[in-house]
């Protein structure tokens, strides 16, 4: 039986949401390991081809003022570039404990350290996994479309209508 990689990614997000300061790195490393699986390499290469993580981080850090929590991430306009940056960011955070702690403290500030990590998870990682799955399943940038809902209601009549059968 094959394991659904997207369900495994979602499980990592759930684990990260419930993690403590002492153990948040394990689900983050698991997430990065799953994202680097062999089946996703071509998609990842396509997403990261036009993005530079260090430039993005430098531009974002320039927005920080003297007030804690004032830094704002400077995302590009293209959805694929945003996904690529988030992918590189998750990989870097999984590799470097100090970077992950400082990044969450700078851009997702809260007085409680674990709350900074949970803010990062809920506002960056969870949407990334959702959008990444959509991107991979479509193999390109999905174009939003309006679909009319189709009714799945079934009308069942209970009774004894023998004449209708003949």
Segments (PLM) and residue ranges:
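Charged interaction/catalytic cores of defense and host-pathogen modules
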Residues: 1-137
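Conserved N-terminal substructure of TIR/SEFIR domains
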Residues: 128, 138-166
């Amino acid at each position: 039986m094959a394991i659904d990689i997207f369900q495994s990614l979602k499980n990592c997000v759930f684990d990260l949401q419930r993690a403590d300061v002492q153990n948040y790195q394990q689900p983050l490393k698991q997430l990065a390991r799953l994202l680097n699986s062999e089946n996703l390499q071509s998609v990842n290469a396509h997403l990261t081809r036009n993005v530079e993580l260090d430039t993005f981080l430098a531009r974002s850090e320039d927005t920080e003022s003297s007030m804690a929590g004032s830094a704002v991430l400077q995302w590009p306009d293209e959805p694929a570039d945003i996904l690529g940056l988030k992918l590189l960011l998750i990989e870097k955070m999984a590799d470097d404990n100090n970077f992950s702690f400082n990044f969450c403290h700078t851009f997702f500030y809260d007085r409680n350290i674990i709350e900074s990590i949970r803010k990062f998870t809920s506002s960056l990682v969870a949407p990334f996994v959702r959008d990444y799955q959509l991107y991979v399943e479509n193999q390109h940038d999905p174009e939003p479309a309006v679909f009319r809902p189709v009714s799945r209601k079934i009308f069942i009549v209970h009774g004894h209508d023998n004449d209708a059968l003949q």
